[in-house]
Design a protein with these regions (language model features):
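Carbohydrate transferase catalytic cores enriched for Leloir-type hexosyltransferases
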Residues: 1-369
Length: 369
């Protein structure tokens, strides 16, 4: 059996979203299934460490996918050549893209359909490409994976895809996320917020992550005793976030952080404040739960499904509701303690080991059908 995998998101300092998902599944599969040959396909020289194993072949083929036209060339010309050359049994694409020209059976993961519901969130050409081709990718796929019951329902409804074709497999979180000692928390706070407690947002600064409303809500709090820390990189150059100069020194933009440092920043936070208006899963929720910290989450899409009783909720479009949620977490010690306990308990429902096992069952069954 030969399983070919789209690994184009395994790029340095970019292991978030698709990259994290790809890495966590692929590294487990290649270690646990030495009876299977894996062809890992990159669009440029990989720098992410993938174990060197006899059953793994790394293939680099251009063009680097930096524009929808290049996406089309890579998936419709480069990928079919590689699948044919290595006699692939199945093609797995963890980012929802597919090759329409290939005759090889495929499994794709569609994480969410934000581009269908909020087209203004994306550059026009990219949004057009996704709306035109993702329905075709889903139709072409032999099986579809997705990461929440909400996303499964959305794909079924938007694309009239049979629910039996779609399997829901929850994501996990890196085991490096753990409750921290008070000494580590103090050291971390001294480093990033002058030892003041802080709210934390983690994620790409994409419009749907709703960081602007979060900042506006935070700056509406009168003389807050808690800072706000933003971790993540901008997705689009034209997406600007504005901060009122009054109190701007209490908001800290840290950019992208590697896992080890992020785990310390996460575990030292007073709470995770995660209020996107559209989400397919939300890995930071599970990272926060593993650390045992409270969560303020949006009450939309998949977020209540994932966060459960580890969070309090707000309308992501209502700045006053977001502000009220922040104020509750500042003022109500009993609430924070209860949410922390709930976080620890709920975190046990999510793991990359389980995600890899359940996803592999779909891959293996499809390849042998």
């Amino acid at each position: 059996m030969v399983i070919a995998i789209n690994c184009r998101h395994l790029t340095p300092n970019k292991l978030e979203g698709f990259g994290t998902y790809t890495y966590e599944l692929v590294t487990r599969w290649i270690k646990e299934h030495n009876e299977v040959n894996f062809v890992l396909i990159f669009d440029r020289e990989p720098t992410v460490v993938i174990p060197e194993l006899p059953n793994v072949k790394k293939v680099i083929i251009g063009p680097p996918t930096r524009h929808p036209l290049l996406y089309w060339i890579w998936f419709e010309w480069s990928i079919p050549r590689i699948l044919k050359r290595y006699k692939a049994t199945l093609f797995f694409s963890p980012d929802g893209y597919n090759s329409l020209r290939s005759r090889v059976p495929s499994v794709i993961t569609v994480h969410d359909l934000n581009f269908e519901h909020n087209p203004a969130d994306l550059p026009k050409v990219l949004g057009w490409y996704l709306r035109k081709f993702v329905p075709k990718f889903v139709e072409k796929a032999t099986r579809v994976l997705t990461v929440s019951a909400y996303s499964k329902q959305d794909i079924t409804k938007c694309y009239r895809c049979a629910s039996e074709k779609i399997s829901t497999v929850y994501n996990g979180a890196n085991e490096i996320y753990q409750p921290l000692s008070e000494d580590v928390k103090i050291t971390t706070r001294k480093r990033i917020s002058n030892n003041r407690p802080y709210f934390l947002f983690v994620g790409s600064l994409h419009p749907r992550k709703n960081v602007q409303r979060l900042i506006t809500a935070y700056q509406g709090i009168n003389n807050p005793s808690v800072d706000l820390v933003i971790v993540g990189s901008a997705m689009w150059r034209d997406h600007q976030i504005s901060v009122d100069p009054n109190g701007a020194d209490r908001i800290h933009f840290l950019g992208y952080l590697a896992q080890k440092e992020l785990a310390e920043v996460m575990g030292s936070a007073l709470a995770l404040t995660y209020v996107p208006y559209f989400e397919g899963f939300g890995i930071p929720l599970v990272e926060a739960m593993r650390c045992g910290i409270p969560i303020l989450a949006a009450n939309t899409t998949c977020l209540p499904e994932i966060a459960g009783n580890a969070a309090i909720y707000c309308d992501p479009f209502n700045v006053q509701e977001i502000q009220t949620g922040l104020e509750q977490l500042i003022e109500n010690d009993t609430l924070r303690i209860q949410l922390s306990e709930n976080s620890i308990n709920r975190a046990t429902e999510f793991s990359w080991d389980q995600a890899a096992k359940q996803s592999w069952e779909v891959i293996y069954t499809t390849a042998n059908t």
